[in-house]
Amino acid sequence: MEGCYLNQIIQRNHYLQKLIDRRENGLVKVITGIRRCGKSFLLFNLFYDYLIESGVKEEQIISIALDDDTFIKYRDPEELSKFIRSKITSKETYYILIDEVQYAIAKDELKNPDSIRLYNVLNGLLRLRNVDIYVTGSSSKMLTKDVLTVFRGRGDEVRVYPISFKEYYAAIG
């Protein structure tokens, strides 16, 4: 099959459904998995499109990719908090989508998860009651091991795995 490439989007509906099922549950949805397994695509494409199709206005979706130089300023948790709060201008529900949150955590903070300022910022945003927060990250030290402990019962993990053979085979027909 020389030169055979899969030039289509593989709908990972079971992961999308997990996010939909957790929508507005009052918890930070933490999407974890190894690098390049589709976390960002799930959040910024599939879930974003779902929100728009279900009637959410674009202004109510705050998307931030912390690995993008455009958002480098928001790697500081206080700046991130100010930015997000400045976008929340009504009582409607706002969907906060943050990609690669490990960029907002200092390496020395990883030694003591209770001192991580980002978690305090996200927990503070949850108190607004009209926000629904989704984050992704690849750092296993930061996300997978202690996610529920660090969020003090306010975290809900969605683990994403690389595409399976079953998904691939279904996509190629």
Task: Give residue spans per PLM region.
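Phosphate-binding site recognition
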Residues: 1-173
